[in-house]
């Protein structure tokens, strides 16, 4: 597990890559990441974001498969189900 500070640093660096159109994940194959993810997941950050199809967290933060645990919700209203998902991720990862 990495610190919250390190996770935020990785997200900010990824967002800078996204904004500057210099993604590292659109240039590499996710194939090498798929097999390990069939066994387990180990995301470094939990993201609560908008359901808007124009705002996928993995792309905006330039992260690969399994790097983020993403909960998406419409209307900026967090219901018990989203809170439960966040609690699950905090306890699990």
Describe each model-derived feature in a short phrase.
Residues 4, 59-93:
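Short HxH-centered metal-ligating active-site micro-motif
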Residues 14-15, 21, 50-52, 73-74:
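Fold-independent oxyanion-binding glycine-rich loops
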Residues 2, 6, 42, 55, ...:
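Conserved active-site and cofactor/substrate-binding residues in soluble primary-metabolism enzymes
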Residues 1-38:
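Long, non-catalytic terminal segments
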Residues 11, 47, 71:
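Divalent metal-coordination and catalytic microenvironments
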Residues 26-66:
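N-terminal short beta-loop-beta anion/metal-coordinating cradle
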């Amino acid at each position: 597990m990495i610190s919250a500070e390190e996770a935020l640093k990785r997200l900010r660096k990824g967002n800078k890559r996204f904004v500057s159109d210099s993604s590292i994940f659109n240039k590499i194959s996710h194939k090498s990441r798929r097999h390990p993810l069939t066994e387990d997941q180990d995301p470094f950050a939990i993201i609560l974001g908008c359901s808007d199809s124009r705002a996928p967290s993995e792309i905006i933060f330039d992260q690969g498969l399994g790097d983020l645990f993403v909960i998406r919700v419409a209307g900026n209203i967090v219901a018990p189900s989203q809170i439960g998902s966040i609690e699950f991720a905090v306890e699990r990862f």
